[in-house]
C-alpha cells in the first residue's frame, strides 16, 4: 500500500485517537486504562493504513491486474502497532500524540500483542515474501489460518514444564476486519463411496463429512495485505 500519511499531524492523530477512545472503547481520557489507550491508538493508526489499503484496492478494480495469491500455514508478522508506526513514518507524531494522552509510546507498545499466526522460519519467510511483493508494487494477497490460540506458552510449575495456549485474542485484535459476507463452507472428514458400472468407472461420492465455515479476516498492513481464515464448526 502506498504511504498516504504526508498530511498527518499531532493534532489530527490525537483527534483520531480520542474519537476511538470514545466510540470504539466507550471511555474518556479519565476513565481509560493503558490497554484502552493502546487499542484506541491502534485503531487510529489502522485508519491511516486503511486509507492506503482502499486506494490500493481501487487501483486493482480499475486496472484488473493479474494477482499473486500466496498460501502459507504460518505468518510471523510481528507486532502490528510498532510495525505500522514505522512503516507509515509517523513515529514522531505518535510520541507527541501519546504524551497528550498522559502516556508514552514505550508504555503503549508493551500492550501490543503479536498475532499468533505462526512461529519460526516458515512464518517469517512468508511475511518477508509479502513484504517483497508489495515493495515491488505487485498485486498480492497472503492467505492463511487464523489460529484462535496461536503458539503455546511454556511455564514452569513445581519444577515441571507446562504448555498453555497463547490467548492472543483475549483482549481483541484491533488490526483485523471480519468479512462474514465471504464465508465459505469447508468439508472435512468422511469417506469416499466407490461406484462402478458395467460400461465405465463412475466417480465416487463423498459422505459422512463435517462442514465447517471458513470466515475470512483481513489484516491491512502497510506495504502488504494479509487475509486469514477462521474455521467455525
Model-predicted segments: where are they?
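A conserved hydrophobic secondary-structure block that centers on an alpha-helix together
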Residues: 123, 128-131
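Extended, regular secondary-structure scaffolds
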Residues: 119, 136-220
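Residues forming anionic-ligand binding surfaces in small-molecule and nucleic-acid pockets
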Residues: 95-114
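Extended, charge-enriched "interface" segments that sit outside catalytic cores
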Residues: 2-63, 67-71, 76, 81-85
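Beta-sheet entry/capping signal
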Residues: 67-69, 131-132, 137-142
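N-terminal catalytic cores of NTP/NDP-binding nucleotidyl/phosphoryl-transfer enzymes
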Residues: 80, 116-120
Amino acid at each position: 500500500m502506498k504511504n498516504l500519511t504526508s498530511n498527518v499531524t499531532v493534532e489530527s492523530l490525537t483527534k483520531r485517537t480520542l474519537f476511538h477512545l470514545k466510540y470504539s472503547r466507550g471511555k474518556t481520557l479519565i476513565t481509560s486504562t493503558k490497554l484502552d489507550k493502546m487499542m484506541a491508538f491502534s485503531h487510529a493508526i489502522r485508519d491511516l493504513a486503511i486509507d492506503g489499503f482502499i486506494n490500493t484496492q481501487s487501483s486493482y478494480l480499475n486496472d484488473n491486474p493479474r494477482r499473486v495469491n500466496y498460501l502459507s500455514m504460518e505468518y510471523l508478522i510481528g507486532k502490528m502497532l510498532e510495525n505500522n508506526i514505522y512503516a507509515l513514518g509517523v513515529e514522531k507524531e505518535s510520541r507527541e500524540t501519546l504524551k497528550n494522552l498522559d502516556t508514552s509510546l514505550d508504555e503503549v507498545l508493551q500492550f501490543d500483542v503479536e498475532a499468533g499466526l505462526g512461529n519460526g522460519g516458515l512464518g517469517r519467510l512468508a511475511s518477508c515474501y509479502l513484504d517483497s511483493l508489495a515493495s515491488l508494487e505487485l498485486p498480492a494477497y497472503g492467505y492463511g489460518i487464523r489460529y484462535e490460540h496461536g503458539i503455546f506458552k511454556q511455564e514452569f510449575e513445581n519444577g515441571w514444564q507446562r504448555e498453555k495456549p497463547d490467548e492472543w485474542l483475549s483482549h481483541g485484535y484491533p488490526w483485523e476486519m471480519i468479512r462474514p459476507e465471504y464465508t465459505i463452507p469447508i468439508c472435512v472428514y468422511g469417506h469416499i463411496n466407490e461406484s462402478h458400472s458395467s460400461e465405465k468407472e463412475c466417480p465416487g461420492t463423498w459422505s459422512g463429512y463435517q462442514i465447517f465455515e471458513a470466515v475470512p479476516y483481513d489484516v491491512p498492513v502497510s506495504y502488504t495485505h494479509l487475509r486469514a481464515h477462521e474455521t467455525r464448526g
